[in-house]
């Protein structure tokens, strides 16, 4: 094809994964000096990728751009073309900017974190490979290329999670993750074949155009939608397939940050990229919403019982992933994208600063909490709800435009109520007023961003899912009741229990309700794993550390 100025953004996006994958082509050699040079190459390449993302955004804003296709090969059985295709729109630009930024921060942090580690060159090579393929996931314009890139990203993450191969618990958790990930890959491949056979093309733009032109989907496309949702559930560590996400904490902290701030969102990205097809099906998203709601409720409660910082962060990620799946299942695709961006940045910061969390907790003042009465709790929630409703009405949000708006406003109201209740439990009147002002400001900012993402990505993401209004009403009611129950249990509901029931609930939640153990036994029965392998050969010779302190 002829390269034109309108392809500038596509070329910039394509250069991002290309640079990272090229940096990883050279196999690491032995020697400390070579290891340091290798890590510097990957670090500066990640910085360059982020710079290219910013240039791509500028190019997209100031000139009319179109999708890029540099090469294609015909697939058998009329499945269409497997093309090196780059889709240029707001979604791919936002995701590419986010991934490249997080990757550059992690690469910079890893230089100090792994300084002196004999395997640091191998780590940076795996980081470049995984990051490069993940960038290809978020920018690809062809479903076949998208699927292959997701599979490659999964294999790269597997190698990173098992980086220290002499840690049996890490190997076991990584193996369990690989079982679910490979199953999701198979489901996504099957969906790709069904879509290609039915439509005759694997280009995302043509898939969307085909779906819009049809009054009803064929059985093959309905099956493909369900397969995509099941793949997203497995990729996103949804309940009851969440255990590996909690148990991979023995991986290096940069790997935890990469996974929890990026790669674990593969499931959400799958749904966002195929939102037109899933919205046309409608019912598959219903399953996604229910599974996400269950994961959110369990994860948010279990998180409060964890004593280890990284374990608490892992359960928090599981809960937030459930929240994201709930938003996608409700058809709030723009809101889910906003959530993905915000939580990815927060989680990267949380994991990379987890080492200083202990010092922060030691220096923090221990505040004596005053018990919150049932009346005070209900009053705070109602007042917060009224403020949220008023701000939403003032900013022009309407239930006619968003049928799920009552559920969204309930969630916002409960979040701001938690801020107020925290101030009421141990704060002075001045702190309570400050908390009230912060809650109002946060609500306004959130509603504003909500409107920006909903309207800004209206041409890129699907509209409301096509399903019976009664199902939407029932799903909204279940969502509101679940959020109210979880908030109540975290507040006065807990204190109304007897000490024996509180202790029993704590034990059950602390163990994740035990379901993961049954899933683990079943999974390992079909695919057992041997642990305790010797560590791989060192790629760099580093002098011994005389202090005896591990880097």
Swiss-Prot record:
Keyword Calcium (UniProt): no
Bilayer topology annotation: Multi-pass membrane protein
Single Gene Ontology MF annotation: NADH dehydrogenase (ubiquinone) activity
The entry's keywords: Cell inner membrane, Cell membrane, Membrane, Transmembrane, Transmembrane helix, Transport
Source organism of the structure: Halothiobacillus neapolitanus (strain ATCC 23641 / c2) (Thiobacillus neapolitanus)
Pfam families: Proton_antipo_M, Proton_antipo_N
NCBIfam families: PRK08168.1
Regulation: Uptake of inorganic carbon by cells in the presence of thiosulphate is fully inhibited by the uncouplers carbonyl cyanide m-chlorophenyl hydrazone (CCCP), carbonyl cyanide p-trifluoromethoxyphenyl hydrazone (FCCP), S13 or SF6847. Not inhibited by the ATPase inhibitor N,N-dicyclohexylcarbodiimide (DCCD). Inorganic carbon uptake is inhibited by the ionophore carbonyl cyanide m-chlorophenyl hydrazone (CCCP), suggesting uptake is coupled to a cation gradient.
Cellular localisation: Cell inner membrane
Cross-referenced InterPro entries: ND/Mrp_TM, NU5C-like, Proton_antipo_N, Transporter_DabB
Subunit structure: Forms a complex with DabA2, possibly a heterodimer.
Job of this protein: Part of an energy-coupled inorganic carbon pump; its substrate may be carbon dioxide. Expression of both dabA2 and dabB2 (DAB2) restores growth in ambient air to E.coli deleted of its carbonic anhydrase genes (called CAfree, deletion of 'can' and 'cynT'); neither dabA2 or dabB2 alone is sufficient. Rescue is pH-independent, suggesting it transports CO(2) and not carbonate ions. Together the genes allow greater than normal uptake of inorganic carbon by E.coli. Uptake of carbon dioxide rather than bicarbonate has been suggested based on kinetic calculations.
Protein name: Probable inorganic carbon transporter subunit DabB2
Any one GO BP annotation for this protein: electron transport coupled proton transport
Transmembrane segments: 6-26, 42-62, 65-85, 86-106, 132-152, 187-207, 217-237, 252-272, 284-304, 321-341, 374-394, 404-424, 434-454, 469-489
Consequence of gene disruption: Required for growth in ambient air.
Recorded name of the encoding gene: dabB2
Lineage, top ranks: Bacteria, Pseudomonadati, Pseudomonadota, Gammaproteobacteria, Chromatiales
Broad class of where this protein is predominantly found: membrane
Top-level division of the source organism's lineage: Bacteria
Entry's Gene Ontology cellular component terms: plasma membrane
Family membership: Belongs to the inorganic carbon transporter (TC 9.A.2) DabB family.
């Amino acid at each position: 094809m002829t390269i034109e100025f309108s392809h500038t953004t596509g070329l910039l996006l394509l250069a991002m994964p290309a640079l990272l994958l090229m940096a990883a082509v050279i196999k690491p050699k032995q020697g400390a000096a070579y290891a340091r040079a290798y890590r510097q190459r990957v670090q500066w390449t990640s910085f360059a990728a982020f710079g290219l993302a910013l240039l791509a955004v500028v190019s997209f804003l100031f000139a009319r751009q179109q999708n890029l296709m540099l090469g294609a090969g015909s697939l058998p059985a009329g499945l269409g073309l497997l093309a090196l295709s780059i889709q240029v729109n707001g979604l791919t630009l936002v995701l590419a900017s986010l991934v490249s930024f997080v990757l550059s921060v992690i690469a910079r942090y890893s230089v100090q974190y792994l300084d002196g580690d004999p395997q640091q060159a191998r780590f940076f090579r795996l980081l470049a490979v995984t990051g490069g393929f993940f960038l290809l996931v978020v920018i690809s314009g062809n479903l076949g290329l998208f699927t292959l890139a997701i599979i490659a990203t999964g294999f790269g993450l597997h190698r990173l999670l098992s980086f220290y191969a002499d840690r049996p618990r890490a190997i076991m958790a990584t193996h369990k993750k690989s079982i679910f990930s490979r199953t999701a890959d198979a489901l996504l491949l099957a969906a790709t074949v069904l879509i290609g056979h039915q439509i005759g093309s694997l280009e995302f733009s043509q898939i969307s155009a085909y779906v819009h032109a049809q009054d009803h989907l064929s059985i093959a496309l309905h099956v493909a939608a369900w397969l995509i949702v099941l793949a997203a559930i497995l990729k996103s560590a949804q309940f009851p397939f969440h255990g590996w996400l909690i148990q991979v904490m023995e991986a290096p902290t940069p790997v935890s940050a990469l996974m929890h701030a990026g790669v674990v969102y593969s499931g959400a990205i799958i749904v966002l990229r195929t939102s037109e097809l899933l919205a046309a099906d409608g019912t598959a998203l219903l399953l996604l919403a229910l599974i996400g709601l269950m994961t959110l409720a369990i994860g948010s409660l279990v998180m409060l019982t964890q004593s280890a910082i990284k374990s608490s962060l892992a359960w928090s990620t599981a809960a937030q992933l459930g929240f994201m799946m709930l938003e996608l299942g409700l058809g709030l695709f723009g809101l889910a994208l906003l959530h993905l961006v915000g939580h990815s940045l927060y989680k990267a910061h949380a994991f990379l600063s987890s080492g200083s969390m202990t010092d922060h907790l030691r220096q923090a003042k221990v505040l004596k909490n005053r018990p919150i009465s049932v009346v005070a709790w209900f009053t705070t929630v109602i007042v917060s709800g009224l403020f949220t409703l008023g701000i939403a009405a003032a900013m022009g949000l309407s239930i006619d435009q968003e049928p799920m708006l009552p559920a969204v406003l309930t969630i916002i109201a409960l979040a701001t109520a938690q801020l107020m209740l925290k101030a009421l439990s141990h704060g002075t009147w001045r702190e309570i007023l400050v908390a009230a002002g912060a809650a109002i400001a946060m609500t306004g900012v959130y509603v504003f961003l909500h409107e920006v993402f909903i309207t800004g990505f209206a041409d890129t993401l699907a509209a409301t899912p096509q399903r019976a209004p009664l199902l939407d009403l029932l799903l909204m009611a279940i969502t509101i009741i679940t959020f109210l129950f979880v908030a109540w249990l975290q507040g006065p509901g807990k204190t109304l229990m007897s000490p024996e029931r509180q202790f029993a609930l704590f034990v059950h939640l602390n163990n994740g309700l035990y379901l993961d153990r049954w899933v683990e036994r079943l999974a390992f029965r079909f695919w057992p794993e041997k642990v305790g392998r010797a560590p791989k050969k060192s790629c760099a010779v580093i002098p011994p550390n005389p202090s005896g302190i591990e880097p």
